[in-house]
Amino acid sequence: MWTLVSWVALTAGLVAGTRCPDGQFCPVACCLDPGGASYSCCRPLLDKWPTTLSRHLGGPCQVDAHCSAGHSCIFTVSGTSSCCPFPEAVACGDGHHCCPRGFHCSADGRSCFQRSGNNSVGAIQCPDSQFECPDFSTCCVMVDGSWGCCPMPQASCCEDRVHCCPHGAFCDLVHTRCITPTGTHPLAKKLPAQRTNRAVALSSSVMCPDARSRCPDGSTCCELPSGKYGCCPMPNATCCSDHLHCCPQDTVCDLIQSKCLSKENATTDLLTKLPAHTVGDVKCDMEVSCPDGYTCCRLQSGAWGCCPFTQAVCCEDHIHCCPAGFTCDTQKGTCEQGPHQVPWMEKAPAHLSLPDPQALKRDVPCDNVSSCPSSDTCCQLTSGEWGCCPIPEAVCCSDHQHCCPQGYTCVAEGQCQRGSEIVAGLEKMPARRASLSHPRDIGCDQHTSCPVGQTCCPSLGGSWACCQLPHAVCCEDRQHCCPAGYTCNVKARSCEKEVVSAQPATFLARSPHVGVKDVECGEGHFCHDNQTCCRDNRQGWACCPYRQGVCCADRRHCCPAGFRCAARGTKCLRREAPRWDAPLRDPALRQLL
């Protein structure tokens, strides 16, 4: 929060300006920067708005019409929209206050300030708390699913996930323009959002009935036509029967007029639901997982731990981790990225993951050779073959092209009717042949196959399972597998590769002849073939039992080719990052004798 300096001089009418304690001259006023270490010029709100107070956000909304006159509907950092008692406003980072457009919020959100120049302070946090956009911009989802920034406040995000329009405008993608009540504007392009590089905050949210979807706090879960859940941007909302819209609490959906009706006969526009966020744990292996937004990292015990960053860097001490793009400085205990330095984080133990209930559901068989996904309904197509209606227990229409939700009847022109309500029918997709495997699949037996690049392994149930490695070794517990050339250590839950034990170096008497297959070290010493000469800590020679081995700086240990010495010579680390889906155990260090 900025601290105002020389306020008395300002109110006394010193239009000539004021001088900051650091000697800087400002035309109006001097403010202490948020960090408290420097000053900059500012202009407090003297005329229209209160000097030290912002305004509290009001009730939920989706458009300005849902707010009182003179108020505006703005997008907040929690992912919902609320009414702000300014006609044009920006949301503060605390999620509870707002300021007029053209101003920025203090750190605690209770004050509004305007800086000289165009540089804005602070940022708008995108809903997942990992990305942020500059002040007076809007978070919009990009084509790849990441967050982007539309360079205007409270913007309308277009369906192509590339463009955006001003607040209240409609995206006309066909003619590449934005349509407003006063005219048209060109489409604006979004820019990628910036990662905040701080730990993911698991904010409070509403869990939907499917136990896999979440909506932001202060919103309501409503089912979509697809059977999945969407979020109505207000608490305790009324979900409309078309599975597309919703209305505020204690109102009724009027789908014919596209309005929400209250007991006082007041009407508001229907609200459109937004897709819910699917809660998907990050899988470390078949048994262990971390929360969404975390990264799996090995602990010192060899078990999995959870780092509170996405795509994090796991530090070599197996205790700490750093944000993506940073490197671990084990001496300082920090994360480094050029001149930037942040504290590193400790990992938390991972938890056992439950099987995905959707993955356990079998396909719906249409006949002996055709099937549909578990949440679909088999309906015949005009060709006589089977098709899949994308909703469970659907009504198959007689035109063999459409289907309707349960409780509806098929009517003309591919529509569905229930009472006075009419919705568009759903088109069917061809069913898949259940008995034919993919032409490039690897057959386990006559009825079961695994994708190419994987290995068939016996499962606990007596059938087959797929190991996500080629030519893998199937472990005897029938739950795990290891890469080719490794053996399963079920007790340690690891994959191990046998390496020959260390051999002592042999001292030779001075002789002009050295064995043909021996490796000459010098000074009358040699090592056997497929070994490597290394200097020992007594300035003599020792033998590393690896061919082209790497001699560690402690002069007591060595590592195989392709590895590097770490942890002061007590550990070997691969020079190339291991596969994410094949957590292999590093070879044991060998003592030099």
From Swiss-Prot:
Disulfide bonds join C126-C139, C133-C149, C284-C296, C290-C306, C297-C314, C307-C321, C315-C328, C322-C335, C366-C378, C372-C388, C397-C410, C404-C416. InterPro entries: Granulin (IPR000118), Granulin_fam (IPR039036), Granulin_sf (IPR037277). Keywords: Cytokine, Disulfide bond, Glycoprotein, Lysosome, Neurodegeneration, Neuronal ceroid lipofuscinosis, Repeat, Secreted, Signal. PROSITE patterns: GRANULINS. Glycans are attached at N118, N236, N265, N368, N530. In myelogenous leukemic cell lines of promonocytic, promyelocytic, and proerythroid lineage, in fibroblasts, and very strongly in epithelial cell lines. Present in inflammatory cells and bone marrow. Highest levels in kidney. Gene3D superfamilies: Granulin. It comes from the Eukaryota. SMART domains: GRAN (SM00277). It is found in: Secreted; Lysosome. Residues 1-17 form the signal peptide. GO terms for molecular function: cytokine activity; growth factor activity; protein-folding chaperone binding; RNA binding. Belongs to the granulin family. Secreted protein that acts as a key regulator of lysosomal function and as a growth factor involved in inflammation, wound healing and cell proliferation. Regulates protein trafficking to lysosomes, and also the activity of lysosomal enzymes. Also facilitates the acidification of lysosomes, causing degradation of mature CTSD by CTSB. In addition, functions as a wound-related growth factor that acts directly on dermal fibroblasts and endothelial cells to promote division, migration and the formation of capillary-like tubule structures. It is linked to Frontotemporal dementia 2: A form of dementia characterized by pathologic finding of frontotemporal lobar degeneration, presenile dementia with behavioral changes, deterioration of cognitive capacities and loss of memory. Gestural apraxia, parkinsonism, visual loss, and visual hallucinations are present in 25 to 40% of patients. Ceroid lipofuscinosis, neuronal, 11: A form of neuronal ceroid lipofuscinosis characterized by rapidly progressive visual loss due to retinal dystrophy, seizures, cerebellar ataxia, and cerebellar atrophy. Cognitive decline may also occur. Neuronal ceroid lipofuscinoses are progressive neurodegenerative, lysosomal storage diseases characterized by intracellular accumulation of autofluorescent liposomal material. This is Progranulin. It comes from Homo sapiens.
